[in-house]
Amino acid sequence: MSKKTDRVIMNDDIRVPEVRCNVDGAESLGIVSTDEAMERANELGLDLVLIAPDAKPPVAKIMDYGKYRYQEERKLKEQKKNQVKIDVKEIKLSVKIAENDINYKVKHAREFLAEGKHVKFRVFLKGREMANPESAKDVLLRVWAMIEDVGVMDKEPKFEGRYYNMYVLPQK
């Protein structure tokens, strides 16, 4: 597996004879020799950065690379901060669960949904319970009847391996 390299080609590392050159926030110099573009960058006290090395001719920009890199890092940090992380809470049930236990687990599920978290209900089938998986579906449907006013069923009760699963999302 190859990693993408973020190596930036700039200043003396640019090995092409001519580039299409732009000055950061100003005019375009057009197609000039790499040496001429480097001289112009040195006059301005900035860096010559190769932006599009695959273009014909390659595109270079005269800019303050340190400032540019700092702004890019801040943008990435801001995007990461604004990402929404979905919290999925799992509630385990059994086929032989008592009514009081269901009420207790439903109370917790309601709290999770009120906080905006997703809830995954799982009924584990043991031993002979595997012979009648519909009983697990009945338990999930009983739970659904208790929480349908605060949640939206994302996935219907579904049999997966030894579990019957149901996903519930908070109402909007």
From Swiss-Prot:
Q: Which GO terms describe its biological process?
A: ribosome disassembly
Query: What are the boundaries of the signal sequence?
Result: none
Which molecular function term from Gene Ontology is one that the record holds?
translation initiation factor activity
Provide the alphabetized UniProt keywords. Answer: Cytoplasm, Initiation factor, Protein biosynthesis
Q: Where are the transmembrane segments?
A: none
What cellular-component terms does GO give this entry? cytosol; membrane
Q: Does the keyword Cytoplasm apply?
A: yes
Superkingdom to which the source organism belongs: Bacteria
List the subcellular locations. Cytoplasm
The answer to keyword Cytoplasm applying to this record is yes
Query: Which protein family is it in?
Result: Belongs to the IF-3 family.
Q: How does it assemble?
A: Monomer.
Q: Provide the function of this protein.
A: IF-3 binds to the 30S ribosomal subunit and shifts the equilibrium between 70S ribosomes and their 50S and 30S subunits in favor of the free subunits, thus enhancing the availability of 30S subunits on which protein synthesis initiation begins.
Indicate what this protein is called per its UniProt record: Translation initiation factor IF-3
Q: Which organism is it from?
A: Sulfurimonas denitrificans (strain ATCC 33889 / DSM 1251)
